[in-house]
Amino acid sequence: LGDVYKRQDIFTGGGISTLGVFALGILPFINASIILQLLTASLPQLEDLQKNEGEAGRRKIAQITRYVALGWGLIQSVVFAMILRQYALEGISEVVFVVQTALCLVTGSMVVMWLSEVITERGIGQGASLVIFLNIVGTLPRTLGATIEAAQTGDRNTVLGIIVLVLVFLVTIVGIIFVQEGARRIPIVSAKRQVGGAGVGVLPTRQSYLPLKLNAGGVMPIIFASAVIFLPVTIANFTKNEWLIRAASLLNPGAANPWPYALAFFALILGFAYFYASLTVNPTDIASNLKKGGVAIPGVRPGSATATYLSGVQNRLTLLGGLFLGSVAIIPAAVERATNVQTFQGLGATSLLILVGVAIDTAK
């Protein structure tokens, strides 16, 4: 399962490979955020806390997220400590080693979580996304160095494979920018009532547009899918269950048969694209606000009909955006395997999506 842990380095900046104090990185916080967002969508109490309690409610949910991140970080820390135990020096108590290592790892993870929250509070950008962005950037020198070294060997197939991969990455970057910036502009018209000395009347209608993004979730579906796909490995290592270990090995991106991993990753990205779109875009609220403001979509009745129309448009847009994200996450990896060029493993399509997406969001 070594290749699975290598993929987790996008959350840790190489921490897992180097086994540093910050080996867990932002991963426990990402997992905790996923759990809380799923619970918020399914539990009325949490949903009410987020929507109706204002800033106090959001702070309460943030506090719950921290506690969940701490708990999940402890579980992952113990798992890693138990894996590392076999490499420890002789004469060290197993219990002492596991406890000390787990405490160091979970403390490092909590420090990273705190830094991400400071970044968010200072208005620099979305903290967790920027931490992952910086982690990926931190691996670039090593990746580029390995690529240059491979090209200098003079092997024709290797050089050709690198050129093909670079072209695929360039096309991918263009596609990411297009999808991240793409939106469906729905025409809307408004007619304001005029009250004055001349009596009551209606001003001429004004037409503008309501933009619905092609990829409403941004890079979050990729980040969430990347985190969730590692959960079976963590659970398998924690329980030592033979069946779970065999099942988790199917999700190894470096396995002889990569299709189970590819299909699972694709399905997770598509699922989280819909999930995150439902969190960021609420057709019912939009329709209600349009109706209150005297704004309508031509040919669509205000109210529930508008909500149904917007929901249908958003679902189609999310399908297109999710299919694109899933394809972009898989195709470059397939090309990498076909060309047998392994130097870009530290900068896969997933990392590229996060780099470009976070850069665009932060620039705004």
Q: Residue locations for each model-derived region?
A:
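Membrane-interface amphipathic helices and adjacent TM-edge segments
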Residues: 30-72, 200-204, 283-310
